[in-house]
């Protein structure tokens, strides 16, 4: 933006001077115009304009008028208005109150609470740093990655952890699988493959509003396992399609006409996104984080991609099939039929042209990656190696370049902050703090005489609805997943059942509010849904999902032998 502004400034200045000298230098003006029309300035030239002083070597200096002549016409002119005060600069650095509160949590635990029996001073000190880090994730005195880095620094400076121990999780296979998955998502957006797939479903199923919703839902479920970012799917593929269809039906954002079509499609896609993400291990970054944290507590799931899909398949598919219909009754659109939608989709597909070479490469690469994720254990190929093979193919064949990877800030940010949390969580386990906490929770639950199924339901509900306090699914996982899994295990809940149920809930609570996930902010920001409706429908659909997953999932997981 700065370069563009400076370029506009220089262009304006040039045109002013040229108009002044046109009478004297017509040939040079023509030369300048011809040069400008032939080669518009590139990004590099714009940047050079932003740092180089403006000079016009083809133009003679403007002759200076005498002070007497210049002042004459201004004698009767009104005085110039006083300059407007410059806006005060925005505050830099950490937010003071969240900073104080976040640090206070750790200081109080470290110095005001005595070290309990069964915990070493080193473990207690690490717990205080960890809790300050978690508090910072919630209160946000700084961006998540920056705050996690400060927590990492504190653990090393206080000699709580050695440098190698503090950075141990940066070599985690799961974390690097997450990073690479962000690059796959960029490939879907860059090639336009995701947009094309969704548009085909609109063409096939879009004759009615309900059919349109099912077409979008099924296309997201198809794309999800190879595009592990709900935010990228929402903002890069489905929201543009929904907005285009809505506007063509006369449904405008921030307008009474929004209820014609846009409001329903937004809510349906938003509520279905959680089930699409819960269906596949690689459909959302937080899924992989959950399994890594479970592994830190000794809960290891063999053949994770297949095990995850088998356990999620029945309840997730039923929810995906029911959600558009339920919302069609609870939050009905004013427009029931959309006969023009298939035509719009067909026109868009025609404009997109035939499937490009890069799209075919993307299809082949993702089919290879998903196949290796499914069969990797049999072939001896870890999931992260399968992802590395896929990314290497995309780089070699030019579908992605390294600048694409470098510009994917969310990937590198996740690597930084989650590696810190995973490393701290692992060291807390090694130092016996997690075992001590589990024993304490077990004693409390035993005193309440709760059976493990009752404790399971209570803890799952608490984990779900506490998300009203969070603005990030991955932040929620980092803050509470390990603690709640430890409580489940202490209450006698089978470890794999507890870990998977918590992970599935992590996807489902992403549709609770307008701030509960990245896709929530994307869809709410479109302007088609009023805030009270977001909260009301979020709570109602959360309850319905809990019933579907609780009832269907209970029998399905029993059939699969998870308990």
From Swiss-Prot:
One of its GO terms (cellular component) is chloroplast. GO terms for biological process: ammonia assimilation cycle; L-glutamate transmembrane transport; malate transmembrane transport; oxaloacetate transport; response to nematode. Residues 16-45, 71-92 are annotated as: Disordered. It is found in: Plastid, Chloroplast inner membrane. It comes from the Eukaryota. Residues 76-90 have a biased composition (Pro residues). GO terms for molecular function: L-glutamate transmembrane transporter activity; malate transmembrane transporter activity; oxaloacetate transmembrane transporter activity. Its main location: plastid. Residues 28-45 have a biased composition (Low complexity). It is a multi-pass membrane protein. Expressed in roots, rosette and cauline leaves, stems, flowers and siliques. InterPro entries: CitT-rel, SLC13A/DASS. Keywords: Chloroplast, Membrane, Plastid, Plastid inner membrane, Transit peptide, Transmembrane, Transmembrane helix, Transport. Residues 1-68 form a transit peptide. The chain crosses the membrane at residues 96-116, 134-154, 165-185, 234-254, 261-281, 308-328, 358-378, 379-399, 414-434, 450-470, 483-503, 537-557. Disruption phenotype: Non-viable seedlings under normal atmospheric conditions, but grow normally under non-photorespiratory conditions high CO(2) conditions. Belongs to the SLC13A/DASS transporter (TC 2.A.47) family. DIT1 subfamily. NCBIfam families: dass (TIGR00785). Glutamate/malate translocator involved with DIT1 in primary ammonia assimilation and in the re-assimilation of ammonia generated by the photorespiratory pathway. Exports the end product of ammonia assimilation, glutamate, from plastids to the cytosol. The precursor for ammonia assimilation, 2-oxoglutarate, is imported from the cytosol by DIT1. This is Dicarboxylate transporter 2.1, chloroplastic. It comes from Arabidopsis thaliana.
